Amino acid sequence: MKVALKIAYDGTKFHGFQRQPNVRTVEGEIIKALNNSGIMFNELKSASRTDKGVSALGNVVAITTEDERITNPMILNAKLKDVWVLSAVKVPSDFHPRFWARSKVYRYYLPSFDLDVEKVKECSKLFLGVHDFSAFSRVDGRETVRSIDRIEVLDLGPVLAIEVEAKSFLWEMVRRIVKTLELCGLGKLSSEEVRKMLRGKFEKSRKVPPAPAEGLLLVEVKYKGIEFPIHDKALEKFRKDMEKRFREKIARAYLLWDMTKI
């Protein structure tokens, strides 16, 4: 039996998704929860191996097991810390969460202070469609041509929510796109320079660095014919935990904001 789990996690608590020795990772936390629950499994595959600091609202992992308890999200939620299982569905035996994905949706939360929001929006449109993203990724030997299906800039007041959807992404691609949009909004990078970079014409010394990982959220992984109904009790627990963290962080944010007014 193969079961796909839709999971959320606070990426600031982990050294990335993929299991590594001597550090806390999302994959390691899930495996520990499976073992502590007494659930035997053969393999665990993920849709996205997010970097250190990157959070998720809808990453997907597939687990092969004969233990029916895995279909109840609360079994693992009772053992997990900083990770939440929101949904569990049975899938075909050949399902692979990465290769079966139709698209992934990422959202970046960028502080909008001093930014020309209209310039950010204008620059964002340049990334739509098929381009060479070698200037906007950490090159690891893979083909650098990718296609962005959708990019939106939502003005939320103190922050911009920049949402990007594509079938596949390169390493650090979203974070480098966001940094480029920020530089455009600050007037430090022109639209023409961005166009040249998207044609693969750039000096390595001028390559745009990535925006901080902590602002990035993997919102959703989409599949054809596979839905993830959210478990009521799992959602209740997740919201309660998130609201507690939000209250703590917003109090600290306002404290820092007040200190800037001296």
Curated annotation (Swiss-Prot):
Pfam families: PseudoU_synth_1. It catalyses: uridine(38/39/40) in tRNA = pseudouridine(38/39/40) in tRNA. Keywords: Isomerase, tRNA processing. InterPro entries: PsdUridine_synth_cat_dom_sf, PsdUridine_synth_TruA, PsdUridine_synth_TruA_a/b_dom, PsdUridine_synth_TruA_C, TruA/RsuA/RluB/E/F_N. Signal peptide: none annotated. Gene3D superfamilies: Pseudouridine synthase I, catalytic domain, C-terminal subdomain (3.30.70.660), Pseudouridine synthase I, catalytic domain, N-terminal subdomain (3.30.70.580). Its EC number is 5.4.99.12. One of its GO terms (molecular function) is tRNA pseudouridine(38-40) synthase activity. It comes from the Archaea. Formation of pseudouridine at positions 38, 39 and 40 in the anticodon stem and loop of transfer RNAs. This is tRNA pseudouridine synthase A. It comes from Pyrococcus horikoshii (strain ATCC 700860 / DSM 12428 / JCM 9974 / NBRC 100139 / OT-3).
